[in-house]
Structure formats: structure tokens, C-alpha cells
């Protein structure tokens, strides 16, 4: 007796799924590993360059602000020196005496002594006489303050140096690989001309034996 096959209704049938692959995209995916790797390296190098430019821009702005600050301090010091020059001025007083035969003019010159009132912070004459040479030596030894040449932020310079080092490392990888390949090619030993196969040696030994007999 044969098996009774149950007839399925049209609603119960499952729809077939047909998968179609794009051969070009499939081939590109399977063979494009090196291409994608090179693209990732290029993107990383571009990102490092962009970050390096930003850090250098920050460093330039910081140095510019330091220069402006130093300029303002120097201008303020010059203004203070001008004010002191105006204060240290000489006052002259003239008195004329008329006589029948000649005229006498008495002029009194008095300087404004700021050291007496301790306005300038200068030492007294007794102290100045004893410590004259020492003050000259100390004034000669004092270094002049120069404009800042380097950034005061060490972290910023460290970031720039690390970014440049990574950029050079990425660019030198290809050169190192090429050099290694060239070195391997040069170190390969050429096959020796005197090397013979086993069959060749057997033939030679056989000929030697026959010639000896």
C-alpha cells in the first residue's frame, strides 16, 4: 500500500528565497584586503597631520600671548622710568641785588632728593660707601630677561613631538620593508656550480670503477 500524501493548501506553502550575489562586489571584497589596509593607513596619517597642525596653531597662539604680555610689561616699566625722570628735576631760585657799580645775582639750585624720603629705596650714604663695588658686581651678574622662545606648556610640546614621531614611523614602515626585501635578495646564495645530483655521482663513480678494472 502506498503512503497517502497529504495535499497542502496554497496558503501553507512557504515562499522560496533566491539569493543573488554581485560577482564584482564579491571579488572586490575578497581581493581588496590590501587596498582597504592602505586606505586605513592613509586615513590615520591624515588624522595625525590634522592634529599636528592644531597643536602647532595652539603653540603659536600661546607664544603670541606671551610676547604681548612681555611687551606690556616693558612699556609699563618705561612709563615708570619717565615718571621718575619728571620727579627728579632741579629747582632754581634767583635773587638779584642791585648795587651802584655792579649787579649781583645769587642762584640757588636744589635737587629733589628722593633717596632721603626713601622713595626710590636707595641706601644711605654710609651704606652706599661701603657696598659700592659689591653692588656693581651684583648688577653686572644679573642676567637680562629675554623674550620667551619656547612654550611654557610642556604637555603641548610633548604632544607635538609624539605626533611627529608617529607620523615619521608610519612613513618609514614602507621604506624598511623595501630595504628588508632587498637585503634578503642579496643574501640568497647562488647555487654552487660544483654541486651534482646523486645519479650523476653514481655514474661518475661507476665510470671510475670500470676504468680502474
From Swiss-Prot:
Residues 169-181, 197-213 have a biased composition (Basic residues). Multifunctional RNA binding protein that plays a role in RNA metabolism and DNA maintenance. Participates in the resolution of DNA stress and the maintenance of genome integrity by localizing to sites of DNA insults. Also plays a role in proper nucleolar organization by limiting nucleolar size and regulating nucleolar number. Mechanistically, regulates the nucleolar levels of fibrillarin and nucleolin, two key players in pre-rRNA processing and ribosome assembly. Residues 117-213 are annotated as: Disordered. PANTHER family: NUCLEOLAR PROTEIN 12 (PTHR14577:SF0). It is found in: Nucleus, Nucleolus; Nucleus; Cytoplasm. Interacts with KIAA1191. GO terms for cellular component: cytoplasm; nucleolus. GO terms for molecular function: identical protein binding; rRNA binding. This is Nucleolar protein 12. The gene is NOL12. The keyword Nucleus applies. Keywords: Coiled coil, Cytoplasm, Nucleus, RNA-binding, rRNA-binding. Belongs to the RRP17 family. It comes from Bos taurus. Residues 32-95 form a coiled coil.
Amino acid at each position: 500500500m502506498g503512503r497517502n500524501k497529504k495535499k497542502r493548501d496554497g496558503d501553507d506553502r512557504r515562499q522560496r528565497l533566491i539569493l543573488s550575489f554581485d560577482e564584482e562586489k564579491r571579488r572586490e571584497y575578497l581581493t581588496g584586503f590590501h587596498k582597504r589596509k592602505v586606505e586605513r593607513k592613509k586615513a590615520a596619517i591624515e588624522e595625525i597631520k590634522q592634529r599636528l597642525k592644531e597643536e602647532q596653531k595652539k603653540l603659536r597662539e600661546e607664544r603670541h600671548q606671551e610676547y604681548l604680555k612681555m611687551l606690556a610689561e616693558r612699556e609699563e616699566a618705561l612709563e615708570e622710568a619717565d615718571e621718575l625722570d619728571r620727579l627728579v628735576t632741579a629747582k632754581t631760585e634767583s635773587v638779584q641785588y642791585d648795587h651802584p657799580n655792579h649787579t649781583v645775582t645769587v642762584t640757588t639750585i636744589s635737587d629733589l632728593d628722593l633717596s632721603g624720603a626713601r622713595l626710590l629705596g636707595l641706601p644711605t650714604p654710609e651704606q652706599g660707601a661701603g657696598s659700592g663695588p659689591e653692588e656693581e658686581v651684583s648688577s653686572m651678574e644679573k642676567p637680562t630677561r629675554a623674550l620667551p622662545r619656547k612654550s611654557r606648556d610642556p604637555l603641548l610640546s610633548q604632544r607635538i613631538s609624539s605626533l611627529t614621531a608617529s607620523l615619521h614611523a608610519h612613513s618609514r614602515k614602507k621604506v624598511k620593508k623595501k630595504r628588508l626585501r632587498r637585503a634578503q635578495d642579496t643574501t640568497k646564495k647562488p647555487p654552487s656550480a660544483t654541486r651534482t645530483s646523486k645519479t650523476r655521482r653514481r655514474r661518475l663513480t661507476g665510470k671510475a670503477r670500470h676504468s680502474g678494472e
